Design a protein with these regions (language model features):
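Short glycine/proline- and aromatic-enriched beta-strand/turn motifs that initiate or cap beta-hairpins
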Residues: 21-74, 78
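Short loop/turn motifs that connect adjacent beta-strands in outer-membrane beta-barrel proteins
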Residues: 33-42, 83-89, 131-138
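Transmembrane beta-barrel domains of outer membrane proteins
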Residues: 36-37, 76-82, 125-129, 182-186, ...
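Residues that define the transmembrane beta-barrel architecture of outer-membrane proteins
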Residues: 41-45, 67-73, 116-122, 137, ...
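Transmembrane beta-strands of outer-membrane beta-barrel proteins
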Residues: 43-49, 73, 89-93, 122, ...
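Transmembrane beta-barrel strands of outer-membrane/channel proteins
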Residues: 47-53, 93-99, 126, 141-149, ...
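Outer-membrane beta-barrel translocator domains and adjoining extracellular loop/strand segments
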Residues: 57-63, 103-110, 153-162, 204-211
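Predominantly the C-terminal beta-signal and adjacent terminal strand-loop region
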Residues: 96, 100, 176-232
Length: 232
């Protein structure tokens, strides 16, 4: 997927979101937003922000490279829409700014480095809003995926004392995508979730082996544990 295609998808997503006036209608009567647990409400907007604990997995280096997570953060907006009548299933998407970081231990071939990557991300998940016996409290397991495009970042090379872009033909590819799974909890307008992203794309650039591992013939994939707070 090219950057132009990704930006076009973002534009279509934003223009497709209806303007919410804080209420919906059920059988001709207004349903106000004070109780978000009521799955008769057809849509919602939300603000999301939280912590990333990312991983970068190397395979095919004649022994996996040792990496350590560098916690970062994410922030963005989401929009959810109910699927059908009478069922508490919601399709949620949005636009998230997210940062990921990894520390790569030095080897005979590679110097010690820290990589910080910045992405614009589109999550697409199916949520099931399960009402509980407690008023205004729901449990919301979800499953879906994400698409992300790198928009910047920094790789710090400690031996040579230089900084370079983390993306390029001899570094990481900009595009990433994968599976997202987790569970959220909501009380009235307040939301919390924990989730995990499993990157399915090989993000190693086409010339990665020429500048890093001599015997590299494998893959680099991402993972990301997320803890998120929000307001709907």
């Amino acid at each position: 997927m090219t950057k132009k295609t990704f930006l076009l998808y973002v534009l279509l997503l934003l223009t497709a979101m209806p303007v919410s006036a804080g209420k919906d209608f059920y059988e001709g009567e207004p349903v106000y937003a004070s109780r978000w647990r009521d799955y008769r409400r057809s849509s919602y907007f939300g603000l999301r922000f939280g912590l990333n604990v990312p991983t970068v997995r190397y395979k095919g280096t004649g022994g996996e490279a040792q990496t350590n997570p560098l916690p970062r953060y994410h922030i963005g907006l989401v929009y959810g829409n109910k699927l059908g009548d009478g069922l508490p299933f919601f399709l949620e998407s949005g636009l998230i700014y997210t940062e990921k970081g990894t520390e790569i231990e030095a080897t005979e071939e590679v110097e010690f480095k820290k990589c910080y990557m910045r992405y614009l991300e589109i999550p697409i998940v199916l949520k099931y809003k399960l009402n509980t016996n407690a008023d205004d409290f729901t449990v919301q397991p979800f499953f879906g995926g994400f698409m992300a495009v790198g928009v910047g970042g920094t790789t710090k090379l400690y031996d040579s004392r230089t900084k370079i872009d983390p993306f390029g033909a001899d570094r990481y590819k900009r595009f990433d995508a994968g599976i997202r799974v987790g569970c959220g909890m909501a009380f009235q307008n307040f939301y919390f979730e924990m989730g995990y992203d499993i990157g399915l794309f090989n993000i190693a650039g086409r010339n990665y082996s020429e500048y890093h591992y001599d015997d590299f013939d494998g893959h680099i994939r991402t993972g990301n544990l997320t803890m998120t707070l929000g307001v709907d």
